C-alpha cells in the first residue's frame, strides 16, 4: 500500500469514520435523540468533521452557525439520524436530508452545498455514500470521459448520477481492490485536484 496515499488521503477519513462509530453509532445516537440532546449530536457531528479537511472553512462556519440554535440543532439531529440510520429508500432519505439542510438557519453563507449535504453520510457510511465536491469531481469526470451532469442545488437525481460515476470507477479499479467510497473519492480527488501534479 502506498504510504503517501494512506497519509494524505485515506487515514484521516478512516479516522473520522472511526470517531463517528465511537461517538454517534446507532445506539449512542438514539440515546441522545431520546434525551433531546440535539445540540450534543450536532456538536459531535461537527467536531468529527472538523478534524478533516473535507469541507471548506466557510462551509464549516456556516454549518456551526446553522446548528447553534436549539431548533437548528434539533432539525439537524433528526435529519442526520434519518439519513444515516433511517428506514426506506436511499432516494427518499437523501431528499429529506436536503430539505432539512435547506431549512437550517443561515447567518452569512448558505448551508445547502454539495459538500455539506454529502460529508456526513460519507463519514458515517463510507461503503454507501460518496463525498461530492463538485469542482474537483467534475474535473475528474471530464478527465475520465464521463458526462457528469452538474446542478448546483443538491438533489437525489444529481447525487444518483454521482453514485453511478463512483460505481463505474469502482468497477474499473477492481484489480486495485477499492475498499469503499473513501478509496473511490480519494482516487477521483487525486485525478481532479490541482494539489497533485500530473
At which residue positions do the language-model features occur?
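An N-terminal alpha-helical hairpin/helix-loop-helix interaction module that forms a charged
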Residues: 1-110, 126-198
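Contiguous, well-ordered alpha-helical segments that form the cores/surfaces of helical PPI scaffolds
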Residues: 117-125
